[in-house]
Amino acid sequence: MKGDYWRTHCIMDCSLLVFALICGSIIGYFLYSFFNQKKLEEKKQAFDDKLKEKEKDLQQREQEMMRNAKIEITSLRQKLELDLEQRTNTIVDLESKNNRREELFNNRTESLNKREEHLDSEQQIISHTKKNLEQQIKEQETILNTQKQQLEKIASLTQDQARQIIMKETRDQTTYEMMSYIKQEEEKAKSEASKKAKTLLVLAMQKYAGDITGEKNISVVNIPNEDMKGRIIGRQGRNIKSLEVLTGVDLIIDESPCTIILSSFDPIRREIAKKTLEFLVSDGRIHPSRIEKALETSTIEVDNFIKEMGEEAAFITKIGEVHPDLIKILGKLHFRISYSQNVLKHSLEVAFLAGKLASEIGENEILARRAGLFHDIGKALDHEMEGSHVEIGVFIASKYKEKKEVIDAIASHHEDQEPQSIIAVLVAIADTLSSARPGARKESVENYIQRLTKLETIANATEGVAKSYAIQAGREIRVIVEPDKIADNFIFQTARTIKEQIEKDISYNGVIKVTVIRETRAVEMAKL
């Protein structure tokens, strides 16, 4: 009994223990699940909070980027609008000036027409005078024949002797009368031609008044201080050597304060080198790799500037469509100097003068401007290609299919060949006007002295000349003749002889005035 009791008691205890364990396990499981679920929810909440922060941060960044983009777009738009406004104002100013000049041109055209009518009437008077002179010559011949018969009868001369006397008297008398008539008509023709030529040129030049500025073979770059010179030279001169090798320009660094001189015969290379050096000085970082980067940037900038200059020249001359490559070649003329004259400005001046002259005589004004603008196009490449600038210009114009009148003007503007069109003649005249006007071009002192000496030599070699003087910078030669060798009416023949010899022996773009002076002095000594 007692054993059963303990057994039963043990079984119950074990059952209770098992039950307690099971209950504890269940309770532990639920507690574990509860706390684990709470931790998961906390982690999820933390993750959601972080996600919201990230989204908020991204939104803020996006808003900031949008604000910056809007600011940049607004700034760029303002710059573009300002640039457009400036260009529009420039175009409006040019059109306004052009309209005013056209008004003045129309008024002057009416005046010119009246002068032409007056010139026609003068021409009729000259023709009438010529007929009268021919009639007088016939009458003189009749009188001479009568005198011949009388001389043969009275002087008992042979016919040959009388003929010689009469021929000499007739020749002298006719020469005197013809020289007097030539002098009178020449003065009248010169007066009328001078008035008409001045009117034409004034009308043409009033439409265009361009400045020609001589340029040198050096450029000067200003630097902020003397220490910058050392940085430009670099360690053992590596920076300055790199600059000179890459740009092809000589850098001259001397004792001149805060300046560096760039020397080169090629103005385009010199301009690129100048911009490169200015960029390096402003940037402050000067070393070989930086020099290469600055050179690349400056080259692109100068190329763009050349294109802009070509486009501007084509625009202001209103010549129509031009091949893009020809535009670039035209822009290079801005950096080309001939006799200290900027070739692009010279070409613009020739274009406007040729155009106005063409309009005066009823020719194609636009075609004349186009031919004038391109007449020196070969000078842009004459240092890159073989041949004269005329030959190169003809090749370029033919390559880009310019009209035959333009090609003819290029080929004949230096009289290398005879002009085949009126346009070519007008371009040659405009070229002479532009290059020969005072101050347009400069020549060396040596050439200047040689030309003056040659003028005086030609004059002194003429028969009957006592002495001569070249004055007005070689634009006039004054000749004094011996009065006992040259008669009054023969000084015109002397002037013409000297003029023809000058035209034959001297090459000069312009007009040289020949003035012949004959002076007779009578001296008597009174004894007291």
From Swiss-Prot:
Domain HD: 343-436
Pfam families: HD (PF01966), KH_1 (PF00013), RNase_Y_N (PF12072)
Gene Ontology MF annotations: RNA binding; RNA endonuclease activity
Keyword match Cell membrane: yes
PROSITE patterns: HD, KH_TYPE_1
E.C. designation(s): 3.1.-.-
Cellular-component GO terms for this entry: plasma membrane
Family from the record: Belongs to the RNase Y family.
Protein name per Swiss-Prot or TrEMBL: Ribonuclease Y
Protein source organism: Onion yellows phytoplasma (strain OY-M)
